[in-house]
């Protein structure tokens, strides 16, 4: 028995993440499974569809919660994180979904990772690169930037006309912060 080829994505999204943020990958993975069944195609290894939740950091300030939980790597500190709009903890939210949050902090994977050969995720582009290209319609991503937000930082300064007031006399808060 060879380890399975796993495909899927996350069901959550970020604000303005696009209509099909992670869902495109779930639908694509299910479409492949349906095609295999309908055509009778039998791959050399099992094909598994995987859907995760809470991969985005927009609600609890931590990304990959679903993956970390699936691999038993969540911590008590993670479970105490509060939802940005309703104030419920991650542990409360997991319980409301019908799961025991304590099962996700044991250090033991919920799934047997040795039975997975690879994970393939089809994902929409959330930027303009492919959309503006006449040549490329598909891209392969080799890395992405991290996600870090500072919601409580304030830049305080004075406004001044950039054409009339020399830079040395301005107190531009954003410029000072950037420098």
Give the residues covered by each predicted segment:
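Short coil/turn connectors at secondary-structure junctions
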Residues: 2-5, 42-47, 114-117, 148-150
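Short helix-loop-beta-strand segments that form the rim/entrance of peptidase-like active sites
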Residues: 36-58
């Amino acid at each position: 028995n060879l380890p399975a080829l796993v495909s899927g994505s996350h069901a959550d999204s970020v604000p303005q993440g696009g209509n099909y943020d992670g869902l495109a990958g779930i639908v694509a993975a299910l479409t492949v499974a349906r095609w295999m069944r309908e055509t009778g195609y039998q791959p050399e290894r099992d094909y598994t569809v995987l859907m995760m939740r809470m991969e985005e950091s927009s609600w609890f300030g931590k990304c990959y919660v679903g993956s970390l939980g699936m691999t038993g790597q969540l911590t008590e500190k993670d479970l105490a994180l509060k939802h940005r709009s309703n104030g419920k903890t991650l542990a409360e939210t997991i319980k409301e979904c019908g799961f025991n949050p304590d099962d996700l902090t044991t250090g033991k994977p919920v799934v047997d990772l040795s039975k997975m050969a690879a994970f393939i995720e089809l994902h929409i582009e959330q930027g303009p690169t492919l959309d503006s290209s006449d040549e490329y319609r598909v891209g392969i991503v080799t890395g992405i930037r991290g996600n870090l937000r500072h919601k409580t930082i304030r830049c305080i300064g004075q406004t001044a006309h950039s054409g009339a007031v020399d830079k040395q006399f301005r107190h531009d808060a954003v410029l000072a912060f950037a420098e």
